[in-house]
Structure formats: C-alpha cells, structure tokens
Amino acid sequence: MSNIRPHSLGLKGLIAVLVVGAAPALGADRVTAKELYAEPPTLISLGFEWQIDGDDNHNATVAVSYRKKGSQPWKQGLPLLRLDHEQITENAFHYTTPNMFAGSIFDLEPDTEYECRFVLSDPDGVEGKAENVVIVRTRFEPKPSDSMD
C-alpha cells in the first residue's frame, strides 16, 4: 500500500503544477519579433516582410503607418497580413511561406523617401523589438535617353 496521500501536494503544489504546465502553451502563443525586411520598391509602392516565431494562436497583429520623411502626421496603412507556412503552388511556384507578416504601402510618389512604422502587438505578449521605423525610397521614374546611340 502506498503511503502517498492523493491530496498531499496541497494548494501550493497544485498551483505550481498548473503554472509550470501552462508555461509552454503561453510561450508558443507569445510572438517573438525577428527581422523586418523591405522588398525592392516600385514607383508607387513599398513592400515589407516581418519574420516572427511563436504566435501559434494567430492573434498577433502589425499596425502600419507611414509619412514622407520629415513630415507630419503619420498616415495609417493597411495592417500586415499574417502568414504561417502556407503552401503556394500556383503555376511554376512551389513555395512554403515562413512564419511572418507581409504587406505593402500603396499610392505613394515616385523617387520619394518615406518613414514607415510597424508596431507588432499580441495579447499573449511580444518578445524582441515590437516597433520598427525604417526609411525607404520609392523608385524614380525612368526617362528615355537624350542620346540617339
């Protein structure tokens, strides 16, 4: 016969077991910010990818705002789209997306510097840099050559 009583852990022991047991679940739901990348610009748009870890419950978001460099106030952009190992198999493409957010800022002016602000938030918590401000220039409009060569 065992000499361990069924309730020998007590309330403190039960709380410790529940907290330790819940820690991995919370860690997987919390988002960890990794690298933010700017895609090659176009004349009137800028594209971005922000790689992350965690956020297994997909409730993290990235708010986007932008402005011409040095101007006020910030304009609101579309939030970045959440991607998590989606399979892309259109035409000749066979690609699996990383765990990340991605999106674009549209309707910009050619050959202009923009400050772009990205704020990562998650009800479960954010590890790493939750806000990034980057300066990116849209492409200039190509002009035909003056020479006839």
Descriptions of predicted regions:
Residues 53-66:
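Solvent-exposed loop/turn segments flanking beta-strands in beta-repeat/beta-sandwich domains
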